[in-house]
């Protein structure tokens, strides 16, 4: 359960949060006669179990709300030109609204070349240079990376104010950390952002100043309660596997059990930011269809429904 005003939910439930909006999107598509008319293509060029799981979740959600989704899977002996050829085909395919590439890629492939081969109007992950540039300039017709958009959505719906607050973002990747830092320091969020990373020597000093901590470095249990002060809000995006006496378990960047009593709000590793990221991918895909078909009045209604 979220909160309004002073009522806080200590541990965020991303599944319930996202499910509420999935139902809204399903009804939205039905109302506007858009069910089964919007197509998402997912390029999968690795054989990692985690990637296959993530793709299956995205596909299931897309189908449940009424989108068409196709997973284009490449074998381990595929080369970069194979992927570029398929992306070029889907760029030209008028029935394709969104194209995403599930990361990581096969070894030897150039990430930027592949991401930037997706035409920006179908880049619903928002990871191309064009869309990252649009984000920096505040162009609302661009696509914001889904995880960064998920962070904004959580902050807004959970009533976590950013105006004038100190936000420490741990992580500087162009996929997650950097977009979050740029967005939160911009209007209308107007936060004072301290951008750190895994090699920041005085990380604990910066963290103690934070009203809000957002971490996305993939270093398990990097942040513990000794590094926090004043019960901040914590959004933990990192995910890693660690060995324990009972086998491998998932861990975030924070030592969850260690800090959960020392914060106002925290996202867990399982059922935290992940479902909301998938939600924002659905939002971006529907948005792409509406922009490409110049359905701007319907787009306005969509943006009011999923306001960030």
Swiss-Prot record:
Domain of life: Bacteria
Cited Pfam families: THF_DHG_CYH, THF_DHG_CYH_C
SUPFAM superfamilies named in the record: Aminoacid dehydrogenase-like, N-terminal domain, NAD(P)-binding Rossmann-fold domains
Annotated GO CC locations: cytosol
Reactions performed catalytically: (6R)-5,10-methylene-5,6,7,8-tetrahydrofolate + NADP(+) = (6R)-5,10-methenyltetrahydrofolate + NADPH; (6R)-5,10-methenyltetrahydrofolate + H2O = (6R)-10-formyltetrahydrofolate + H(+)
GO biological process, one term: L-histidine biosynthetic process
Signal peptide positions (record): none
Pathway where it operates: One-carbon metabolism; tetrahydrofolate interconversion
InterPro entries, sorted: Aminoacid_DH-like_N_sf, NAD(P)-bd_dom_sf, THF_DH/CycHdrlase, THF_DH/CycHdrlase_cat_dom, THF_DH/CycHdrlase_NAD-bd_dom
Transmembrane segments: none
Residues noted as binding NADP(+) in the record, renumbered to the chain: 171-173, 198, 239
Keywords, comma-separated and alphabetical: Amino-acid biosynthesis, Histidine biosynthesis, Hydrolase, Methionine biosynthesis, Multifunctional enzyme, NADP, One-carbon metabolism, Oxidoreductase, Purine biosynthesis
GO molecular function: methenyltetrahydrofolate cyclohydrolase activity; methylenetetrahydrofolate dehydrogenase (NADP+) activity
EC number per UniProt: 1.5.1.5, 3.5.4.9
Role description: Catalyzes the oxidation of 5,10-methylenetetrahydrofolate to 5,10-methenyltetrahydrofolate and then the hydrolysis of 5,10-methenyltetrahydrofolate to 10-formyltetrahydrofolate.
PANTHER family, per the entry: C-1-TETRAHYDROFOLATE SYNTHASE, CYTOPLASMIC (PTHR48099:SF5), C-1-TETRAHYDROFOLATE SYNTHASE, CYTOPLASMIC-RELATED (PTHR48099)
Family: Belongs to the tetrahydrofolate dehydrogenase/cyclohydrolase family.
Assembly and interaction partners: Homodimer.
HAMAP family per UniProt: THF_DHG_CYH (MF_01576)
Name of this chain's protein: Bifunctional protein FolD
Organism: Borreliella burgdorferi (strain ZS7) (Borrelia burgdorferi)
């Amino acid at each position: 359960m979220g909160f309004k005003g002073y009522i806080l939910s200590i541990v965020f439930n991303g599944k319930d949060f996202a499910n509420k909006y999935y139902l809204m999107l399903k009804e939205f598509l039905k109302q506007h006669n858009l069910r089964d008319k919007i197509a998402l293509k997912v390029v999968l060029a690795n054989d990692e179990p985690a990637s296959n799981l993530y793709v299956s979740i995205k596909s299931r959600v897309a189908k449940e709300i009424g989108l068409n989704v196709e997973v284009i899977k490449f074998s381990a002996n595929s080369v970069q030109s194979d992927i570029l050829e398929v992306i070029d085909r889907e760029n030209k395919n008028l029935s394709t609204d969104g194209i995403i590439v599930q990361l990581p890629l096969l070894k030897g492939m150039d990430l930027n070349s592949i991401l930037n081969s997706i035409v920006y109007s179908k880049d619903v992950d928002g990871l191309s240079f064009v869309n990252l540039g649009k984000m920096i300039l505040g162009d609302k017709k661009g696509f914001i990376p889904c995880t960064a958009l998920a962070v904004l959505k959580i902050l807004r719906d959970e009533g976590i104010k950013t105006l004038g607050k100190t936000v420490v973002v741990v992580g500087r990747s162009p996929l997650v950390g950097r977009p979050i830092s740029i967005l939160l320091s911009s209007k209308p969020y107007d936060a004072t952002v301290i951008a750190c990373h895994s090699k920041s020597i005085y990380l604990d000093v910066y963290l103690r100043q934070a009203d809000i901590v957002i971490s996305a470095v993939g270093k398990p249990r990097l942040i513990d309660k000794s590094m926090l002060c004043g019960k901040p809000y914590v959004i933990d995006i990192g995910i890693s596997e660690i060995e324990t006496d009972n086998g491998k378990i998932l861990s975030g960047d924070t030592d969850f059990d260690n800090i959960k009593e020392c914060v106002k709000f925290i996202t867990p590793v399982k059922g935290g930011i992940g479902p909301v990221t998938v939600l924002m991918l659905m939002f971006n895909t529907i948005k792409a269809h509406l922009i490409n078909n110049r359905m701007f009045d319907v787009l306005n209604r969509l943006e009011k429904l999923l306001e960030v």
